[in-house]
C-alpha cells in the first residue's frame, strides 16, 4: 500500500481559516458591541438622570453582594449551604423584629385605651406601687 502524500495546502488553509474564526470572531464582537458610555448617551435625558441617581445605590448593592460572597466562601461548607443558612437566620431575625414591633404596637394601643378611659398610664401606676 502506497502512503499518501501530506497535503500541506489543505492544512494551511484550515489553520488560516481557524485562526481567522478564533481571532476574528471575538474581535468583530468587540468592534460591534457599544461601550457603556455610548449606551448611556443614547438614553433619553430622563433615563440618564434616573440612572445617575441610582448609580451609587446599585454600586453599594453590588459591593454588599461581593462582600457576602467573600464572607460565605471562607467557610468549609459549600457556598449554597452557607447562603441558605444565612437566609434562614435573616428570616428569623426579621420575624423577631416583627414580633417586637407588634408587641410595641400592642403596648401603645393599651396605653392609648387607658388614657381614653382616664386611668393612669401603666408605667406610672407600676412605679407608684413599688
Swiss-Prot record:
The keyword Membrane applies. GO terms for biological process: mitochondrial respiratory chain complex III assembly. Residues 93-118 form a coiled coil. It is a single-pass membrane protein. Keywords: Chaperone, Coiled coil, Membrane, Mitochondrion, Mitochondrion inner membrane, Transmembrane, Transmembrane helix. It holds the Pfam family CBP4. Essential for the assembly of ubiquinol-cytochrome c reductase. It has a direct effect on the correct occurrence of the Rieske protein, core 4, core 5 and apocytochrome b. PANTHER family: ASSEMBLY FACTOR CBP4. Belongs to the CBP4 family. This is Assembly factor CBP4. The lineage of its organism: Eukaryota, Fungi, Dikarya, Ascomycota, Pezizomycotina.
